[in-house]
Amino acid sequence: MNSVARFKRVYVEITSSCNLHCSFCQETLRKPHFMSVDEFRTVIERIGHYTNYIYLHVKGEPLLHPQLGEILKICQDADMTVNLTTNATLIKEKLPVLLEYPVHQINVSLHSADDNDCIDMDSYIHNLFESCETLLDKTDTEISLRLWNTKKEPFLFGEKNCTIKRHLYVNVQSPFEWPDVNSTYCNERGFCQGLRQHMAILCDGTVVP
């Protein structure tokens, strides 16, 4: 593998399917699809000369993938540093896989659970914290609990980011808005890092900035 990475990171969408319907997540017109293990292996082989840092997320819920273990093993064998973003509804179910093939960082979108009335919050929080404790105890995985400050007021912790304990963090951000060519908002300043610092590969193999 090339020691000098061209991209800081590459996003690889292993599935476009999700088990939640969040109001803040832009609906896709693409058909639900799961990238096969062979397709994923090909992706890793082809991007290996450009980066060693991947995010298993664009749209969709990565923990839904039925062959997640095989995918993480491919990453491990290729010496890829892996981050994944999840709503964590399946984290207890997928815990054995995450223990067998630990990733560098798991980003948990807590606002996803808060946005779906179908979720039993008591069970969700219990399973999440129990799984986090196990991962923190048995692996070096870092866990970032992400919240959106929709009220735009000083947050409870007094800071946007804080460390709860070793490898466990809380990250507070403003709500993310997906780019929309039909939006009436136009910023006069800005710069797109797409194809400069990162790129993404969708589950059907399409490459996007």
Report each predicted region and the residues it spans:
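Conserved strand-turn element in the central/C-terminal portion of the radical SAM core barrel
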Residues: 113-115, 131-161
